[in-house]
Amino acid sequence: MSSTPNFSMPMLHAAQAQKEITHNEALVLVDALLRGAVNAVLNDPAPLAPAPGQAWIVGPAPVGAWVGHAGKIAICSDGGWRFATAPAGMQLRDDMAAVCRRFDGSAWSAYPPIAAPVGGSIVDAEARATLAAVLAALQQAGLASVT
């Protein structure tokens, strides 16, 4: 096996020369992916002034340095862009949109927003306050968006 099964991180081999290069490449990927978040979903890296370690989900119509990497995770490193293919079921927080995105194996999507409670024939103030607090906590954690 030359790479790991989930994120295609390079593996060391017996008698391999310059093992530190392979090891460092894997560490760059681990460092970015363990964060569990990306800056945003974008198609064009041109306007960015990225710092090493920052990551983005490449949109469906990439241009420039991201051409051919639609749906992948673009990671900025000292050596340029690195691209990781997400396994089905992976979830990342999109910091710009403040939502959690999930990869289903072919595309990224955000969880649908939860409607805030309204109406009803009997209003229970304590129940509404508790539900509002739960929804606020989920939203703050990036697990839900409330409309």
Where are these regions (language model features)?
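Basic/aromatic-rich interaction segments and small domains that mediate binding to polyanionic partners
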Residues: 76-80, 84
